[in-house]
């Protein structure tokens, strides 16, 4: 990491001027940030770590502290003739965040171009205070493989679609790396990012990403890690840890687009992936097909309900869980304890709920814990924890 990059991030004008405070720790050296996160993690997991077992905590994994983020969620503010893509500042002002240093340079340039696109299309930004206007958000996702993009316009109604379609050919001619464009209709006057209806304006409906030679796909509503550099190391570490157990059968619960399970999969392993979001399951199925995997099944189901419907005889050798911030919950903890697989690999984006879940998983002990700093300058981080049957 170059000194220039570190200094550039520390001199973030948005933060210094109080316009954006999302990166609350940006003025601290990255090493100091990670040290604080490590201490927080160790304190939360201390009740589950035997005495003199500090070696269970492996060195934290970090990446670049700028230019790493692959997704932008821009509120569209201002007026049709002078739109602003960004956020509302703590003082209530519209702040243009196109130059946010978390985004790669090519992404910053495209965000500026999208500002002009909104102006040229004459799309009136949605005014929350007046419940008027059309364009609520612009959501942009970047693939690191070829620098390709998925672009979404979140509208209040169908009224703005014709204007988008009118200006879209010129945008795609200028930016052929935009592979997927869609409109999401969100008619509700509430702080909700997206609605149920998705309308594709391109033939392509998915964006390809690739981690460690594993193809993964992104669709508009499927969750995907926002820091690909560190996420690739997270998936590779999971693959290495799982391989130590030589499992013949594997469950990947809360599997999303299949990142963990597909990294561990082979035709010698029976893999079952469970995820509530149907779009994510469709992506996982595409990946499995592209990889030529035969003993793989991905299903759009609730992970807790899936586990409740299984008996101990159905248990796999190893179970991976990668829940949202709320954790897996007491009911699923009980199911995992009853299944008693050889090991449980828990990937958590919230160490507080990880610790809470560990209280309810019976008959297991931690053997490895590692912190992955997917979210520099914030209090958030990812944790990989290996639990082995007593």
UniProtKB/Swiss-Prot annotation:
<feature type="binding site">
    <location>
        <position position="225"/>
    </location>
    <ligand>
        <name>S-adenosyl-L-methionine</name>
    </ligand>
</feature>
<dbReference type="InterPro" id="IPR030390">
    <property type="entry name" value="MeTrfase_TrmA_AS"/>
</dbReference>
<protein>
    <recommendedName>
        <fullName>23S rRNA (uracil(747)-C(5))-methyltransferase RlmC</fullName>
        <ecNumber>2.1.1.189</ecNumber>
    </recommendedName>
</protein>
<dbReference type="GO" id="GO:0070475">
    <property type="term" value="P:rRNA base methylation"/>
</dbReference>
<dbReference type="GO" id="GO:0070041">
    <property type="term" value="F:rRNA (uridine-C5-)-methyltransferase activity"/>
</dbReference>
<feature type="binding site">
    <location>
        <position position="322"/>
    </location>
    <ligand>
        <name>S-adenosyl-L-methionine</name>
    </ligand>
</feature>
<dbReference type="InterPro" id="IPR029063">
    <property type="entry name" value="SAM-dependent_MTases_sf"/>
</dbReference>
<feature type="binding site">
    <location>
        <position position="23"/>
    </location>
    <ligand>
        <name>[4Fe-4S] cluster</name>
    </ligand>
</feature>
<feature type="binding site">
    <location>
        <position position="12"/>
    </location>
    <ligand>
        <name>[4Fe-4S] cluster</name>
    </ligand>
</feature>
<dbReference type="Pfam" id="PF05958">
    <property type="entry name" value="tRNA_U5-meth_tr"/>
</dbReference>
<keyword id="KW-0479">Metal-binding</keyword>
<feature type="binding site">
    <location>
        <position position="20"/>
    </location>
    <ligand>
        <name>[4Fe-4S] cluster</name>
    </ligand>
</feature>
<keyword id="KW-0004">4Fe-4S</keyword>
<comment type="function">
    <text>Catalyzes the formation of 5-methyl-uridine at position 747 (m5U747) in 23S rRNA.</text>
</comment>
<dbReference type="GO" id="GO:0051539">
    <property type="term" value="F:4 iron, 4 sulfur cluster binding"/>
</dbReference>
<dbReference type="InterPro" id="IPR011825">
    <property type="entry name" value="23SrRNA_MeTrfase_RlmC"/>
</dbReference>
<keyword id="KW-0489">Methyltransferase</keyword>
<feature type="active site" description="Nucleophile">
    <location>
        <position position="349"/>
    </location>
</feature>
<keyword id="KW-0949">S-adenosyl-L-methionine</keyword>
<feature type="binding site">
    <location>
        <position position="254"/>
    </location>
    <ligand>
        <name>S-adenosyl-L-methionine</name>
    </ligand>
</feature>
<feature type="binding site">
    <location>
        <position position="100"/>
    </location>
    <ligand>
        <name>[4Fe-4S] cluster</name>
    </ligand>
</feature>
<keyword id="KW-0808">Transferase</keyword>
<keyword id="KW-0408">Iron</keyword>
<comment type="similarity">
    <text>Belongs to the class I-like SAM-binding methyltransferase superfamily. RNA M5U methyltransferase family. RlmC subfamily.</text>
</comment>
<keyword id="KW-0411">Iron-sulfur</keyword>
<dbReference type="InterPro" id="IPR030391">
    <property type="entry name" value="MeTrfase_TrmA_CS"/>
</dbReference>
<dbReference type="GO" id="GO:0005506">
    <property type="term" value="F:iron ion binding"/>
</dbReference>
<keyword id="KW-0698">rRNA processing</keyword>
<dbReference type="InterPro" id="IPR010280">
    <property type="entry name" value="U5_MeTrfase_fam"/>
</dbReference>
<feature type="binding site">
    <location>
        <position position="275"/>
    </location>
    <ligand>
        <name>S-adenosyl-L-methionine</name>
    </ligand>
</feature>
């Amino acid at each position: 990491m170059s000194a220039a990059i570190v200094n550039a991030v520390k001199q973030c004008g948005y933060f210094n001027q109080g316009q954006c405070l999302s990166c609350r720790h940006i003025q601290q050296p990255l090493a100091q940030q990670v040290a604080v996160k490590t201490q927080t993690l160790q304190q939360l997991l201390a009740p589950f770590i035997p005495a003199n077992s500090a070696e269970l905590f492996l060195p934290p994994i970090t990446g670049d502290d700028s230019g790493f983020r692959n997704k932008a969620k821009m509120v569209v503010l201002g007026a049709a003739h002078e739109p602003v893509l960004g956020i509302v500042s703590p003082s209530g002002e519209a702040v243009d965040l196109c130059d946010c240093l978390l985004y790669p340079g090519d992404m910053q340039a495209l965000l500026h171009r999208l500002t002009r696109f909104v102006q040229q299309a004459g799309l009136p930004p949605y005014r929350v205070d007046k419940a008027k206007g059309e364009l609520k958000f612009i959501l942009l996702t970047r693939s690191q493989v070829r620098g390709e993009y998925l672009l979404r316009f979140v509208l209040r109604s169908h009224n703005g679609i014709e204007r988008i379609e009118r200006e879209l050919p010129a945008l795609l001619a200028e930016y052929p790396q935009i592979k997927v464009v869609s409109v999401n209709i969100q008619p509700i006057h509430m702080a909700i990012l997206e609605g149920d209806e998705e309308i594709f304006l391109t033939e392509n409906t998915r964006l390809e990403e690739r981690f460690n030679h594993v193809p993964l796909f992104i669709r508009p509503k499927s969750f995907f890690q926002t820091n690909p550099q560190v996420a690739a190391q997270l998936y590779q570490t999971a693959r290495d840890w799982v391989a130590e157990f030589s499992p013949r059968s594997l469950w990947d619960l809360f599997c999303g687009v299949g990142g963990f399970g597909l990294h561990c999969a082979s035709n010698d392993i029976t893999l079952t992936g469970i995820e509530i979001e149907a779009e994510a399951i469709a992506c996982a199925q595409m990946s499995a097909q592209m990889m030529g995997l035969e003993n793989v099944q991905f299903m759009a189901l609730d992970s807790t309900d899936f586990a409740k419907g299984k008996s101990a005889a159905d248990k796999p050798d190893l179970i991976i869980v990668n829940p949202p911030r709320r954790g897996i919950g007491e009911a699923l903890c009980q199911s995992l304890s009853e299944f008693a697989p050889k090991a449980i690999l828990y990937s958590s984006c919230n160490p507080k709920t990880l610790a809470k879940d560990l209280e309810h998983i019976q008959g297991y002990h931690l053997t490895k814990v590692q912190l992955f700093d997917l979210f520099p300058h914030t209090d958030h981080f990812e944790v990989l924890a290996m639990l082995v049957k007593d």
